[in-house]
Design a protein with these regions (language model features):
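Non-catalytic N-terminal targeting/anchoring module and adjacent flexible stem/linker
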Residues: 32, 171-172, 176-394
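Nucleotide-sugar donor-binding/catalytic module of glycosyltransferases
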Residues: 1-160
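Catalytic core of nucleotide-sugar-dependent glycosyltransferases
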Residues: 131-135, 141-171, 193-220
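Noncatalytic linker/hinge segments flanking ATPase motor cores
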Residues: 81, 86, 164-172, 226-228
């Protein structure tokens, strides 16, 4: 790409990847948009659509509700990381080059160095970039996540340098840069095990670097991430505020202080139901709660205010790890409830949250759900609302 930049003579530049293609109208529409907004913008973005083994929209396509110029100081969540789905004003590139020390994220670094100049991003809704998804996990991204560079040089050459560029130009890490950093970090945090790639000392260095980056990202940016589960966000907040003390299994009371500040915002007071069935006047319930302080979190079920103890189940595949750190514990349970009265009210509680009612959520296998709130059996109907399941005769 750097060689191509040296040879390019056009007014606008794009870096189309060899496995992908662009719709025929895109070049005309992008050219016309650039000509109309030439002095405002240096970068124009178009939507990404997947084809091949996966079809659908790229997660960042939400910003293409209409064609126009996005002010990144007012819409910092309208981030751009893809180079191939971007078009660049040639004269604005100047001495900016792709960082050859990066195997991945070189696009994102290049794009956002340019965006830091004007803080504006052109959006052309009518354009289309078609990105090929492969059946086998043989992409550069899949390969690179199995190399040391993905965790060491990528952090230093992309995240650190992007922080430096923003601070040098504006004296702070601008909000849209924070969104870029956090969006990119989510893929890192979702990796469970890395001890087969990094040594103990390298993992320690990685966490020191991650803590530094997180401390340059505002809380609302973390909260607003759409593709990170709330349990993992909790771990990220612990890392940000407790740092190495958290990794060293710091005192319960310090973790609890952070936890209590985020518990309502992240809706952590929840029980997840896998199975809810009614057969022969007996209700069978199977589910789990997630705890962050200790491995054991007993679940108690209140049936018409009478306490039922649950039986503990073990599903090791549900263990929650991020980058070799076990950050949360799934406590799986089951119980049988005999139907001995006409109207039954079922609630779930745990001592972990001082016996407050747990909001009820459902996993995919469950016939009840948060959208389908009714379950019919031969003789009964079950209804869920908030923290209560009610079972009545039909």
């Amino acid at each position: 790409r750097n060689l191509g930049l040296n040879e390019a003579q056009g007014k606008y530049i794009n870096f189309l990847d060899s496995d992908d293609y662009i719709s025929s109208n895109t070049f005309r529409d992008v050219y016309n948009f650039f000509e109309k907004h030439y002095s405002e913008i240096d970068v124009v973005s178009i939507p990404i659509y997947y084809f091949g083994s996966q079809k659908g929209n790229h997660p960042l396509n939400f910003k293409f509700k209409k064609t126009g110029v996005a002010d990144l100081s007012k819409q910092p969540e309208f981030i751009q990381l893809s180079g191939p789905s971007s078009f660049f004003k040639a004269e604005a590139i100047g001495d900016i080059k792709f960082n050859v020390k990066l195997q991945t994220a070189e696009d994102a670094f290049f794009v956002n160095q340019l965006l830091l100049n004007k803080l504006k991003l052109g959006l052309v809704k009518s354009g289309s970039y078609f990105y090929r998804k492969f059946e086998a996990k043989n992409s550069l991204l899949d390969y690179s996540s199995k190399t040391k560079g993905y965790y060491i040089s990528r952090i230093k050459q992309f995240h650190f340098k992007l922080i430096y560029c923003s601070k040098k130009k504006y004296g702070e890490v601008l909000k849209f840069i924070q969104y870029v950093l956090m969006y990119d970090l989510q893929w890192l945090f979702k990796i469970k095990k890395i001890d087969h790639i990094l040594s103990h000392d390298e993992i320690h260095e990685l966490y020191i670097n991650l803590i530094f980056i997180l401390q340059n990202i505002d809380d609302d940016v973390i909260y607003n991430q759409k593709n990170i589960q709330n349990q993992l966000k909790t771990h990220i907040f612990f890392l940000k505020y407790l740092g190495n003390d958290y990794l060293a299994n710091c005192d319960y009371k310090y973790r609890k202080q952070v936890y209590e500040e985020i518990i309502d915002k992240l809706s952590l007071n929840q029980v997840f139901i896998d199975i809810f069935e009614i057969q022969n006047d007996v209700i069978y319930v199977s589910g789990f709660i997630t705890t962050f302080f200790n491995k054991k979190g007993n679940v108690f079920v209140f049936v018409n205010d009478k306490i039922f103890e649950t039986k503990e189940l073990e599903y090791p595949q549900r263990d929650r790890f991020s980058l070799n750190f076990e950050y949360a514990f799934n406590n799986d349970f089951e119980l049988y409830i005999p139907i001995t009265s006409k109207n039954i009210k079922i609630q779930f509680k745990t001592e972990v949250n001082d016996f407050k009612d747990l909001e009820i959520k459902f996993t995919r296998p469950c016939r009840l759900s948060n959208t389908s709130k009714y379950l019919l059996s031969k003789n009964h109907i079950a209804k869920v609302k908030g923290s209560t399941i009610t079972v009545k005769p039909k």
